[in-house]
Amino acid sequence: FNTEFWQSPQAEAFFRSVPQGKLLILDLYCDVTPGWPKFENAFFGQPWIWCIIQNFGGQVSLHGGLDIMAADLRKAFEQRGKASGNMAGIGYAMEGLCYNPVIDEFQSDMIWRTSIPDTTEWLSGFVKRRYGKDSLKAREVWGKLHQTVYQQNQNHGNILQAQPSFTYKVTKPDKTFALIWKSFLDISDEVGKEKTYQFDIVNVTRHALGLLAPLYYGKLITAYLNKDRDALKAAYEKMDELINDIDRQLATNSEFLLGAWLERAKRWGHTQDEKKQYEWNARKIISVWAFDGELNDYAAKQWSGMMRDYYGRRWRHFYKSIDKSLADGTKWD
């Protein structure tokens, strides 16, 4: 909705103009801004679906408002026939799956429930199912994820995937998550052979390394502002090393490979021209998205191949251009 226009009178006129039961409403963004509490009997008695978007553009992220989801779902369940009106089901509006399986599974599980469980209790069962055994250490480390990244209902992205500029916020590395990453490594002796763990450790490592990016970015920008080319070079080399480290560790799991994405796209083609076209489309959608560039990086991917050969090259061009401006004594543009 355009919230400025769609006040209660406008919404009521719209929803009541359709016979009851002849309209099914998808409340798309209930994990962040649910629409159903804003109106009488949710959507004036029309059947509606409690949905989450959670992921835009299939971006690779580690986030999800697990407790926020549970709280709003619990409220909707308990107020059926009253404030939540004619809630008819639970749905998905994600633009990508895979990278936060705990959120996907929680949403799926709630479809079959008549009441919403305590998230801590539910998470213990999830960990056991995910790794095929009941590991206390695994449950503990997932509990730490629950209290950090899975309290965040929005993806804030990463500087490394952003178009280089001077405008990004500089933050200190998150030592808390570094300790979680270490704990995740420590459970490999119990669950390390499970493919689900092998996926998870790459995902968690990727996120932990990415949290170092603002540190090196800050040093890069400070060096430029101080017109210190030696410090600028040192900061860039650290940033480039980080990008390459992330790329190498992503290459250890097939779910994080640019090449796998491109090969799947080409398989849809029956001729060489079709294969080339599908590959071009696959490359375009994860980079510039469209022709006018207004959605650049909308579907940004932390994949091996993308980190080093796409994002890494962009930062290299940025470094060279700002270093040249210092060498020439000119303003960077």
What feature does the model see in each segment?
Residues 308-333:
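Extended, compositionally biased alpha-helical segments that mediate assembly or anchoring
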Residues 215, 277-281, 314:
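Non-catalytic C-terminal accessory domains or segments of carbohydrate-active enzymes
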Residues 223-231, 325, 329:
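Secondary-structure edge/capping motif, primarily at the C-terminal ends of alpha-helices
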Residues 103-111, 205, 209, 311, ...:
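Short, Φ-rich (hydrophobic/aromatic) sequence segments
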Residues 170-192, 202-225:
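C-terminal substrate/ligand-recognition segments
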Residues 187-201, 249-264:
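Short, solvent-exposed, charged loop/turn and helix-capping segments
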Residues 1-146, 151-155, 163-174, 226, ...:
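Catalytic-core regions of glycoside hydrolase
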Residues 142-145, 181-184, 209-213, 217, ...:
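Short amphipathic alpha-helical coiled-coil/interface segments
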